[in-house]
Amino acid sequence: MSTRYKFSGNNLFGQWFLNEPILEKFQLVSKNHGLDFKLMHMSWSHNVFQSKNAIYVSGAWDNNENVVKRLDLFFGVELKATDLLAAGNDDFFYVVDVKRLTIWIMHHEFDKTFTFYPLDLKFTLGKMEKENNDIEIVKMIVSNKSVYFLTNKGCIFTGIPPIYLDTRHCLGRVCDVACGYEHCILLTDFGHVYTWGSGKRFQLGHGDIEDIDKPQEVDALAGIKITKIAAGGYHCLALSEFGDAYTWGWNDEGQLGILDNVEHPSIENPIQYSIPKLIDIYDENGEIVTIDIVDIACGSKHSALKLADNTVWTSGYNKYGQLGLSSKMFPSVKYFRKVYESCINFKIMCGIWCTVIETTSN
């Protein structure tokens, strides 16, 4: 199985193995040092990827740039890189063994090596479930302030040491979780969406700016089965089973991609939307596009959609070319524009200041 990536956006630290500091159109990322890699994590200054049974970091690391370095984590413990998850923020970098429930942590400024901790999730889950065997971590994400773990039992833990986040009031089992800078969003297998955290930029979708300390359902989506969620810096996207996408939160750079006035697209849209709003996509002639949306992704201040015809549409902040457009011609885009199309299937992902297209072949 071979994975290939096309990338547009910030490469200021050489994290994408390319010479140009900014890529304003999607360009194929070639193998570096002969490594066939699988991307694990994107930050604004470095990437983490798996190659065979090892984990590497590329970009800015240990006060250097254009680094490609194998991470030495394991202190003689034999592990499979396929059993590991990696993520980080400006302060800490985390690597988790999803099966052994252990974590390695490094502080970017003060640490030169990783510190090992056990994650005692089974003890906590044992208080709630009779059967707590075969627990695995299926996703790890980080916000500016914390780290979150989602297990195959649908439980969320936060912090080090991990504390159980009570989601027993949620309708269905938690199947996904995402974080912005100061807020979080989760999805259940019943298609219900819940948010919590800071609401000061309307990113929670509850119609106000109140902060919430535990997951609360987004009422405007309660009658719609949602199949995927994404979180930007201060905004969210949600994809429905019918191929519609909804968005809400901060819109200072057009990251919500909403065009309220089709006849006069130059008119500024509101800087925020406090509840989810249906996204309409328009072609270059101003005609509405009726093709289903099949994938969504969020960066810090931009968003990306994939349609069923294998096209990618982006909107929002474009200082680093993360929309796949010229940053001089389009410093920001206020509504979704088509920027890429392909005859083969692919996935879309967004880093903080980049957009990535991933294809997999045998």
Which functions belong to the PLM regions below?
Residues M1-N362:
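Eukaryote-biased RCC1-like beta-propeller repeat architecture
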